[in-house]
Amino acid sequence: MKKITLLLLATTLCLVGLNAQDVLTTEEMNSVYKKEKHQNKRVQQYAPLRQADVMWSRKIWREIDLRQKINHPFYYPENDGVAQTIQDRKSLIDVIYSAIQEGSITAYGNATRDDEFREEMSQDAIKKIGGAKEEMVETTNWEKVAEGFSEEESTEMTLSKKEFDRNQVKKWRLKEEWFFDKQRSVMDVRIIGMAPLKEDRDEVSGQLTGGFSPLFWVYFPEAREILINAEVFNLVKNNAERRTYDDIFWKRMFGSTITKESSVMDRKVNEYMVGLDALLEAERIKTEIFNMEHDLWEY
């Protein structure tokens, strides 16, 4: 009798173990192999840099237009009011905005006039990013009206929420510094800050004006701790080679246009050049930086 009981117990335990193994996660069901998480990936450190090693430097501001094909991985998947996740991927604004709400990244306000991280955004300001707001509005309870109450008696105060439409972020502005490190004999660049640019709309008509305004600034070295664990789509269409946003910025795998350089008058390119001339001026600045490094060597 004892042998039969032990045999039944062993059989039951084996069946329970098999059932536990049969329970698959959603991620495992959508792939032929188990994907390792990026949460433990560590940021690649910059090479040590001393002031005495920098023989030349220049600050550059550039904008990444997410409507360009090469920059689509920054924009998709689109947002429907909540952060959309497709195969562990989120858009760049979803990654940054979620980290700001959690307190993992510090957001700096007064973004239109200040890109030097002087003013941290308060919690109230963070809740209002991109026009998001909560307010009490009067609404009519039509069920009460159907029961015979007047519209005035059926009026109620309800909480109305307007979410931050992250799909309107169509550009990102980068502040970076190019420098020549004589210790390593290389021209190098490091991103200092980044800001999402939201499409401007006319307050009366609600129509797009064609302009863009920065919502906030983020200190890039701090954001790297979040970006290193945020997976991004590989445009080579090789899902086995998984990349993160930090990889994309580190390898400069994006298209952009220079909009400003450090100068005595501190002007943007579009303040003294217009249209095609502004694009040519951006190319001139880019070529000037290239020639600066090229002219240091003899061939």
Segment roles from a protein language model:
Residues L15, G103, R190-G193:
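Glycine-centered flexibility motif
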Residues Q21-K182, R201, F220-Y299:
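A domain-level signal for the mature, folded cores of soluble proteins
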Residues N167-V169, V189-I191, S213-L215:
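Extracytoplasmic
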Residues D181, V186, I191-G210:
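Extended serine/threonine-enriched, polar tracts that run as long, contiguous segments within proteins
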Residues S205-E222:
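Short linear, low-complexity motifs centered on an aromatic residue
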